[in-house]
């Protein structure tokens, strides 16, 4: 009988949920759900200095917002807990003490200064820096001497000599490392806290993880973890290392690159939809069969095949994300779109926090004008700018339109029609434009474009009669007058 698939997402609580980490979580989630397996969340919090207050809560909150759930973890429990590494220190202690007893690990008393001097010497000689194993075979006398000096040891794993470590990677196929390229590596720091590679190998085994899907920046950790598995006689899980995410310059996505929004929390704040972000991330380094790109969560679960994970870097295309979110925005009801947009108009000072019924209805109609066009909630501030200004500026293309010979005649006639209207409604404005056509003989672009540019300042935009109705009589007449002179 085959083992049940068990995968994990194991973030460090060092900050908010990044797009790259979200992708790792998502691919593990889809892999588990597709194969009726278990998805586990484990918190790797042993690097206490880097942990951020609220980091763990933020990770979990935004994974949930994206639509993921998990079977075991810090907040839901499970039979393989605890799921927070700082609560597993006794487990690690028993195991590294076992390695020490069997001579597969040893105490290293070298100071940071000695290690740095060794490293600098290797670089000066043109060698690849690695620990030279100086404290591998210390005598009892040397140990006593170091301890008398007050030196606190770290614990290093004794790397086997002349060994090949190969594994079949789910993404990269055959991957090979040679043990002679590694120095003996630290498995327990001087403060008694296990290092990443030791704790991860122990946790993955004890939690019965069958597949480890992670970013390929972890690939060099894999042979070290394999050595630890081997030292304990444990079965090695299957590894899959997903390619990097790159920006439009084909450089690795860096958290320091502020030209790209990279944290899930920021997308939520901007009024993006979780389903769209889920969809977009699922296609960052994985592709379905066929050309279709819009899928529901259930569709992704049904068709997810790890064999289709890409070997090439995944391009983070911000414009494509906007396009994708727009596809999802179009499907939302107006209430949802208002909910995503209105807070941004309040924040920009366009409307107050409390609105009269009349103002609520008006702003709802303004947002409705852009429902089909809007990429994300915050975009409403820029899109609807013309409704909140007394005067409009004309783009170069718009100015050319207003230079037409027929423009004064068309705009005067239209101003007369608007002046006569008792109620500014789209149907009445449509009728007014038709009346101008009859009166002046101008039609098509020669009729519509001057009216659009003079009233909205734009050559393209929402339905003209609806926009003019919402602008209101006073604003429209003022703008027409400004052009007529």
From Swiss-Prot:
GO terms for molecular function: ATP binding; glutamate-tRNA ligase activity; tRNA binding; zinc ion binding. One of its GO terms (biological process) is glutamyl-tRNA aminoacylation. The keyword Cytoplasm applies. It is an enzyme of class 6 (ligase). Monomer. Catalyzes the attachment of glutamate to tRNA(Glu) in a two-step reaction: glutamate is first activated by ATP to form Glu-AMP and then transferred to the acceptor end of tRNA(Glu). This is Glutamate--tRNA ligase. It comes from Bacillus cereus (strain ATCC 14579 / DSM 31 / CCUG 7414 / JCM 2152 / NBRC 15305 / NCIMB 9373 / NCTC 2599 / NRRL B-3711). The gene is gltX.
